[in-house]
């Protein structure tokens, strides 16, 4: 369900907990900190054309998904779009920033609902495209859990496709590292 901006402030600590828990695992391995998380989430409390969708178990928030205008995302994602994609006006793209859900709640439809809500929101604010960036890791990385289920087939079933040669770069600190380093993410897009 959509979370109204006026209702976000009391949930920010819980949202931060969920993000840090989920992003600490494969494939992100993000070693986050509360200050960076709170700064990042402030955007969603102020931009009327951003969205936070929550998954709840009763009153308990167990997952969130966000979206914001492509042009307001902190990273300059447009610079990573190759060739013809640069002709697409940035005002036509909604960036699907993240979907994070506690593992015990996966496989029951929350992920599909996250995409459905964000796609509907994109159309409501006049966006023709939705895009996200997925971290790229070596499939032979020894940190990859046995039995990890790759989301690529599922994203394709939802109608998303990777944009060839659209690899963006973002920095974050992995668990077990002393400092942040560059990670590559594949941009995926869907026309609505």
Summary of predicted features, one role per range:
Residues 49-54, 64, 98, 185-187:
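Short hydrophobic/aromatic beta-strand element in the GNAT-like acyltransferase core
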Residues 17-32:
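Helix-loop element at the rim of GNAT/NAT acetyltransferase active sites that forms part
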Residues 1-15:
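A short beta-loop-alpha structural element at the N-terminal edge
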Residues 28-57, 66-69:
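Active-site rim helix/loop that mediates acceptor-substrate recognition in acyltransferases
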Residues 123-128, 136-165:
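Conserved active-site alpha-helix within GNAT-family acetyltransferase domains
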Residues 64-99, 142-143, 166-179:
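Conserved acyl-donor/pantetheine-binding loop and adjacent beta-alpha core of acyl/acetyltransferases
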Residues 98-101, 107-124:
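Conserved acetyl-CoA-binding loop-helix of GNAT-fold acetyltransferases
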Residues 96, 130-133:
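Conserved hydrophobic beta-strand within the GNAT/NAT acetyltransferase core sheet
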């Amino acid at each position: 369900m959509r979370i109204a901006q006026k209702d976000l402030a009391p949930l920010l600590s819980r949202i931060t907990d969920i993000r840090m828990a989920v992003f600490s695992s494969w494939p992100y391995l993000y070693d986050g900190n509360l200050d960076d998380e709170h700064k990042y989430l402030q955007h969603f409390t102020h931009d009327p054309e951003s969205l936070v969708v929550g998954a709840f178990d009763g009153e308990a928030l167990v997952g969130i998904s966000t979206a914001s205008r492509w042009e307001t995302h902190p990273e300059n994602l447009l610079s990573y779009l190759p060739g013809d994609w640069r002709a697409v006006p940035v005002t036509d793209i909604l960036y699907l920033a993240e979907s994070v859900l506690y593992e015990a709640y996966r496989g029951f439809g929350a992920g599909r609902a996250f995409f459905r809500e964000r796609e509907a929101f994109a159309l409501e604010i006049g966006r023709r495209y939705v895009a996200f960036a997925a971290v790229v890791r070596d499939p032979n990385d020894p940190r990859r859990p046995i039995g990890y289920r790759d989301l690529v087939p599922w994203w394709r079933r939802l109608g998303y496709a990777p944009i060839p040669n659209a690899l963006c770069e973002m920095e974050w600190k992995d668990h077990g590292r002393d400092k942040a380093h560059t990670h590559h993410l594949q941009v995926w897009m869907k026309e609505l």
